[in-house]
């Protein structure tokens, strides 16, 4: 399932083509994805100006000029592509001429620019695990998808003092604690595995072990915080990771998977300089964890 870097990549790919354009028609080719589409979805969005594209955690937000945002979650296989009648006039660099299977084109945004030039943004989702909803931005924190979300692993909100506050007294394994979206929003399985490897921490370490008696972060928690921020920044720069069905808005694939140090590398040599260990896989809370038991302690 796409994590924060993948959704950020899609947002950046779509923004040049969608921002500042008017939504002349929302074409719905079915009434539901994972959940039913909003009541009067097409009617409520017709004629609205798209003022910006944004992101919260793993959700893409299409912000309209009436204070409402369209919430889009990509699920397991959701992707967007952009089509213009005049390809040479396509804004931005993101374009994919054809979907992999157009029978899975479920939602089509018909847009017009300042000069009336038409453009279509098409949501394709073979498995239909994604969903779309609408939310008033002023009440976004009340929406089920956003209520209680923690800070994101980008910007200045995430620091070691915050994690020490959340981890104090918590016996939960470190990896499980980091996957809690109420602790850090948008952080998923891939990047938790990678950050723990960079910080040389075992995914089974109790979260409370990184907090001292005074409730302050130990040095290892400082290292982990920096590792999280770094791995997310590098993944965004690389365009996310192309696992299973993730695809960027231009039809190309992300390439951070070529930088994986532990994720999906079971049985391969650890890449920590001087370490002779081998990457192993185990299951935690129903998810695969990849780690090096020799240098992650």
Swiss-Prot record:
Its EC number(s): 3.2.2.23, 4.2.99.18
Reaction(s) the record says it catalyses: Hydrolysis of DNA containing ring-opened 7-methylguanine residues, releasing 2,6-diamino-4-hydroxy-5-(N-methyl)formamidopyrimidine; 2'-deoxyribonucleotide-(2'-deoxyribose 5'-phosphate)-2'-deoxyribonucleotide-DNA = a 3'-end 2'-deoxyribonucleotide-(2,3-dehydro-2,3-deoxyribose 5'-phosphate)-DNA + a 5'-end 5'-phospho-2'-deoxyribonucleoside-DNA + H(+)
Cofactor binding annotation: Binds 1 zinc ion per subunit.
Zinc fingers typed FPG-type, residue spans: 261-297
Gene Ontology molecular function terms on file: 8-oxo-7,8-dihydroguanine DNA N-glycosylase activity; class I DNA-(apurinic or apyrimidinic site) endonuclease activity; damaged DNA binding; zinc ion binding
CDD domains hit by this protein: EcFpg-like_N
Stored InterPro entries: DNA_glyclase/AP_lyase_DNA-bd, Formamido-pyr_DNA_Glyclase, FPG_cat, MutM-like_N-ter, Ribosomal_uS13-like_H2TH, Znf_DNA_glyclase/AP_lyase
Role: Involved in base excision repair of DNA damaged by oxidation or by mutagenic agents. Acts as a DNA glycosylase that recognizes and removes damaged bases. Has a preference for oxidized purines, such as 7,8-dihydro-8-oxoguanine (8-oxoG). Has AP (apurinic/apyrimidinic) lyase activity and introduces nicks in the DNA strand. Cleaves the DNA backbone by beta-delta elimination to generate a single-strand break at the site of the removed base with both 3'- and 5'-phosphates.
Assembly, per entry: Monomer.
Listed name of the protein: Formamidopyrimidine-DNA glycosylase
Species of origin: Allorhizobium ampelinum (strain ATCC BAA-846 / DSM 112012 / S4)
């Amino acid at each position: 399932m796409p994590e924060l870097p993948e959704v950020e990549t899609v947002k950046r790919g779509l923004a040049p083509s969608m921002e500042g354009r008017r939504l002349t028609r929302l074409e719905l080719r079915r009434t539901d994805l994972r959940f039913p589409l909003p009541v009067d979805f097409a009617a409520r969005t017709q004629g609205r100006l798209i003022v910006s594209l944004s992101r919260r955690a793993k959700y893409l937000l299409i912000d309209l000029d009436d204070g409402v945002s369209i919430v889009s979650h990509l699920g397991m296989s959701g992707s967007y592509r952009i089509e213009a009648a005049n390809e040479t006039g396509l804004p931005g660099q993101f374009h994919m001429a054809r979907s992999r299977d157009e029978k899975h084109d479920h939602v089509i945004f018909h847009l017009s620019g300042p000069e009336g030039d038409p453009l279509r943004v098409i949501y394709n989702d073979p498995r239909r695990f994604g969903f779309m909803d609408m939310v008033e931005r002023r009440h976004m924190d009340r929406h089920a998808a956003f209520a209680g979300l923690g800070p994101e692993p980008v910007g200045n909100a995430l620091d070691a003092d915050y994690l020490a506050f959340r981890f104090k007294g918590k016996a939960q394994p470190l990896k499980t604690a980091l996957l809690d979206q109420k602790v850090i929003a948008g952080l998923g399985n891939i990047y938790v595995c990678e950050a723990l490897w960079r910080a040389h921490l075992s995914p089974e370490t109790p979260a409370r072990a990184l907090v001292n008696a005074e409730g302050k972060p130990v040095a290892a928690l400082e290292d982990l915080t920096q590792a999280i921020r770094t791995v997310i920044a590098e993944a965004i720069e690389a365009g996310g990771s192309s696992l299973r069905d993730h695809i960027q808005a231009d039809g190309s694939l992300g390439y951070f998977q070529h930088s994986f140090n532990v994720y999906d590398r079971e049985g391969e040599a650890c890449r920590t300089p001087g370490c002779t260990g081998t990457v192993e896989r185990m299951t935690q809370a129903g998810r695969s964890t990849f780690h090096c038991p020799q240098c992650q302690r």
